[in-house]
């Protein structure tokens, strides 16, 4: 077992591994311990993942190192964990986009110092003008006096 495979197993509960194994085995028709790359998309969709054709091609290219056209169960686990992490990252970015829209009171695509102060006041948090200025300075990477969505994402990376 490679380090990647051991890491993938440590990320998953025994229940998840058993669920993945059951799905994997359904497509391992001959019981040989591997599935064809063509069947991979079907298995992933059964397990609640939604890879695009491009993502599947990239995943398969990474996983099927020997070019055999088949993927064994350990390689499959590594791939599923990668996909789960990607999905989680996408969801958290969607949630942050929703927060940004809420904070951007005037819907101009930016959060300014006044909007930032309002956020804290609404949450009952007492924040001084200096603290607001400091937060703006830290978040406003291009020094235009306001925080755009990309700057907001970078700011929030440090919080999570």
From Swiss-Prot:
The protein's name in its UniProt record: Troponin C, skeletal muscle
Gene3D superfamilies in the cross-refs: EF-hand (1.10.238.10)
PROSITE patterns cross-referenced by the UniProt entry: EF_HAND_1 (PS00018), EF_HAND_2 (PS50222)
Binding-site residues for Ca(2+) 4, renumbered to this chain: 140, 142, 144, 146, 151
GO terms, biological process: regulation of muscle contraction; skeletal muscle contraction
Chain positions found as N-acetylthreonine: 2
GO molecular function: actin binding; calcium ion binding
Tissue-level expression: Fast skeletal muscle.
Function: Troponin is the central regulatory protein of striated muscle contraction. Tn consists of three components: Tn-I which is the inhibitor of actomyosin ATPase, Tn-T which contains the binding site for tropomyosin and Tn-C. The binding of calcium to Tn-C abolishes the inhibitory action of Tn on actin filaments.
Family: Belongs to the troponin C family.
Note: Skeletal muscle troponin C binds four calcium ions.
Record keywords: Acetylation, Calcium, Metal-binding, Muscle protein, Repeat
Gene designation per UniProt: Tnnc2
Annotated signal sequence range: none
Residue numbers binding Ca(2+) 2: 64, 66, 68, 70, 75
Any matching Pfam family: EF-hand_7
The EF-hand domain, residue ranges: 15-50, 51-86, 91-126, 127-160
Residues annotated for Ca(2+) 3 binding in this entry: 104, 106, 108, 110, 115
Binding site residues for Ca(2+) 1: 28, 30, 34, 39
Top-level lineage group: Eukaryota
GO cellular component, one term: troponin complex
Matches recorded under InterPro entries: CALM/Myosin/TropC-like, EF-hand-dom_pair, EF_Hand_1_Ca_BS, EF_hand_dom
